[in-house]
Amino acid sequence: MEKTKYVFIGARGHERVMSSVLESNHDELLAVFDANPALHDLDGVKSEGEYKQNIHPEAKLIIAIGDNAVREQLSHNIKHTFGSAIHAKAVVDRLTNLGVGVQIVHGAVVNRGSSIGKHTIINTNATVDHDCQVGDFVHVAPGATICGGVKIGNGTLVGANATILPNCTIGKNVRIGAGAVVTKSIPDNVLAVGVPAKIIQHG
């Protein structure tokens, strides 16, 4: 079986996670782009410095950066064929809809009837249950649980080990704190923390 070839933008922690995803599928990482010279040639992968469109144009590009706003900005500015990557030990039901650039890592679960927007990260051991709608440029952090029927707006961060209970709607650009339990819907552009989750910051 022919290997899929990739290049990454980003040479920080999330790049290492995504390198592991490629290895699980026996795919090939050709190069990493990052403007910070201190991060070049991490884990033996050749760094090309800042992104250049003419380097490995045949490869699929993944924005291996955890920050939602940065992923969105780069996706609008880069002219390259984007790829998605799913770890061999993730579970993604066949009746799901995945956008371009999706990153689903070790132990993650995406259940039947759910949709995951473009350039969204479903991180280690996170669960998206049935019939959820997860927007673009979302990050569901390690261990988070999204129960059935939840809707999550673009650019939202669901913190590590947070839980969103069934049928809640989470707005755009929301930050859900680590370990929070969301029991009701949350509007756009807020920070919510605690058990049960309460809004502590707007904007």
Predicted regions and their residues:
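Short, Lys/Arg-enriched, disordered terminal segments
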Residues: 1-5, 57, 201-203
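Hydrophobic, well-ordered beta-alpha structural blocks that scaffold small-molecule cofactor pockets
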Residues: 1-52
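Generic structural signal for conserved hydrophobic packing positions in ordered secondary structure
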Residues: 10, 61, 82, 129-130
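Short alpha-helical
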Residues: 13-14, 69-70, 181
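Alpha-helical elements of the RecA-like P-loop NTPase motor core of helicases
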Residues: 16-20, 72, 184, 201
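Short amphipathic alpha-helical segments
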Residues: 19-22, 45, 73-77, 116, ...
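Phosphate-bearing ligand-interacting subdomains
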Residues: 37-93
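Structural signal for interior beta-strand "rungs" in well-ordered beta-sheet cores
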Residues: 85-193, 197-200
